[in-house]
Each structure stands twice: as C-alpha cells, then as structure tokens.
Amino acid sequence: MTDGPIKVNSEIGALKTVLLKRPGKELENLVPDYLDGLLFDDIPYLEVAQKEHDHFAQVLREEGVEVLYLEKLAAESIENPQVRSEFIDDVLAESKKTILGHEEEIKALFATLSNQELVDKIMSGVRKEEINPKCTHLVEYMDDKYPFYLDPMPNLYFTRDPQASIGHGITINRMFWRARRRESIFIQYIVKHHPRFKDANIPIWLDRDCPFNIEGGDELVLSKEVLAIGVSERTSAQAIEKLARRIFENPQATFKKVVAIEIPTSRTFMHLDTVFTMIDYDKFTIHSAILKAEGNMNIFIIEYDDVNKDISIKQSSHLKDTLEDVLGIDDIQFIPTGNGDVIDGAREQWNDGSNTLCIRPGVVVTYDRNYVSNDLLRQKGIKVIEISGSELVRGRGGPRCMSQPLFREDI
C-alpha cells in the first residue's frame, strides 16, 4: 500500500510529521470563576506559554520533524465559501447552550473576518461584549454573569486528544467533557477538505458522531499489530470495542490485537498516556500507582476470532506479562516516574513526568522540571531532550499530550 499523509504504526518510529496547536488568546479568556468548566486548574501566562511552545516546535524541527499547525490547516480547509458556511453552522450548532439565540449576530461578526481570523476567533471564544445585542429573549433579562456567547477552547494545544492517528487512518473523537466536545470539528474539516488530506481516502476508524467517548491520550499504537487503549474517565469500553471492530473489519488494517487497560477514573490519571508511555522497543515509562500489586489490574485483550467471525476477549491481570506476550518481547522494562518514590513520583506525575513524546527509538522529549524521572531515563540508556514548560504544564499535559503524530517511519 502506498503511504498517504497519515501513517503511524508505532509509538517509537522516527517521527516525521506532527500536528501542533500554538497556544492563543483562548488562554487569556480563562478566568478563575470558570476554570473548572473549562478543565483548567490555573491560568497560564500566554506570552511565556507561547515561547515554551515555540521552543518545543523548534526542538522537533531540529530533530527532522515537519511541524504542522492545527489553526493554519483549519483555515486552509475552509477556502470554499460553502465549506466555510457549513463550518460556522457546525460550530454554532454545538454552542447553543451559550449562544442564547444570537446565531445571526455572531454570524455577522464572523462575516467580517478572514478565514484565519475566523478560526482563531472560534478557538479563542466570543465574549458577550463583542456582540452586545439588544435584549430580545427573556433569559437575557436574568442576572446572568456568564461572559461568553462562544466558549474559549483553552485545551486545544493538547492536540493528542481530539484525534488519533492509527495506521493509515484516524479516529475523530467524541470528547468526554462538553468543554472539549467542539475541538474535533477542526480535524473533521481538515481531513475532508484540506488539499493535503481530502483525496487520500483516509480511513476514519471512528467519527465524532460516535455515541461513545474516546480521547487520543488513551490511544497508544504499540506496534503495527497491537494497540493499547486506556479505559478511563474519558474513554469508554464501548468506544474501544467499536474501534476494535472497525479496524478488524478493514482489510487494509494490520492490527490484530487491542489491549484495553483500565486506569483509575480521576483527573490525576486523566488518560493512559499520563501514566504510561512507550519510549523504546522494550521500555515504558510508568506511574507506579497504576500497577497496584501486579496481578491486580483489569486488562483485556481483544482479538478477531476467525472461526466464530466475531471478536474474542481475554482477561489478564499482569501488565508486564501481557505486554511481553502481545509484543513478543522477552523482558519489558518499566521505568517508574520519580523513581517510584511516594513523593517524587506523585509530584512528577502531576507535572506529566510519564507523558513523554518519543521521536525515535530511545529518544524522548520531556519537561525539564521532572529531573528525577529524566535522570532515571538517562541511566536506563534513553536520550532525553528537555524543554521548559512551567506555563504549558498548568493545563495538565506534557509533550505527548501537546503533539499528534501524523507520520512515523516504520520500525
């Protein structure tokens, strides 16, 4: 099969093309009263966050990675006036709770904007003061202090979650929280309308109309035959089974097994990749807290049964044994966040010490603040490229969260 614009058959193959989103004014629309609803714990300082993100992007370029930006691709995808109109309608249709019937006024604002300005405005949010219409609905006479007609999307710089590259295809995800639900609209339009992608016949394993929640931070491509997916607060067992069935049904897909790993449902353990990432052929970072006592985990191996013409599900309780079996590796090494220390491990996991981005086998990008974990990685033979992230980390995501690989070399 000829390679298209998407090819990701592992977590560790040399990264050639990546999708990023530079933090924008959406971060300046974060205010203390509404942090919880927008899934933030703190307010990053935009100027510094942008400098940190620009350095992250430059590090990737210096390692031979082509960096694409979500906001630029999205603007290039709506050049056709009809597509632009449909895009606006789709965004507004998912914002009815805050728009309060002012679609036409918002469309009038959008009509004054270029394609890039439109995308940036939708991402950053529309404040009520930008529209300031006369009160025409009873709800507007109520004592409503909420400042937005269109909510900002401050989580967009975590490009890992709204979509996930799997093989030559992609999942366009239904996000768990309403605050992030609109984020996958952008990749939907990019895949369907951008010149780089639209004629490539990219398999859509799951689309955003799927009734079940799934997020890219839970989707790991361990090899061309094995996926690992976290059953988490944000990714449902139903979505994992649906994804497995769709992949097994596709003759172009090479994947034979889907390993579903249950993790605690809490913000601390937001996605599988916040506690577990693959960094070399036989090495994984891991947060010790998810291991419990080995032999006490809920792990499920989903395969296609050729005899019964349906999926089969086997249960396991040992993560190390399961990975060694499905990957055909004799001795998997787990490298614990913060060296497994009860204090260092918890602190560095909170600051995404497990959330490494592998750019080729044995070479990772990490936050410099997680020095205990980084030193241990080096002791285990891993090359660690450190970036600063004092502002970026306030969104509770690391280098893997901030990147969506579109193309990796096979291993």
From Swiss-Prot:
Gene Ontology annotations of biological process type: arginine catabolic process to ornithine; arginine deiminase pathway
Enzyme class: hydrolase
Enzymatic reactions: L-arginine + H2O = L-citrulline + NH4(+)
Name of encoding gene: arcA
Keyword Thylakoid on entry: no
UniProt organism field: Staphylococcus aureus (strain MRSA252)
UniProt keyword annotation of Hydrolase present: yes
Functional pathway: Amino-acid degradation; L-arginine degradation via ADI pathway; carbamoyl phosphate from L-arginine: step 1/2
E.C. no: 3.5.3.6
A GO MF label: arginine deiminase activity
UniProt keyword terms in alphabetical order: Arginine metabolism, Cytoplasm, Hydrolase
Catalytic-site annotation from UniProt: C401 (amidino-cysteine intermediate)
Localization annotation: Cytoplasm
InterPro entries cross-referenced by the UniProt entry: Arg_deiminase (IPR003876)
Gene Ontology CC annotations of this record: cytoplasm
First-listed, main subcellular location of the protein, grouped into a coarse class: cytoplasm
The name this protein goes by in its record: Arginine deiminase
Pfam family, one: ADI
Similarity annotation: Belongs to the arginine deiminase family.
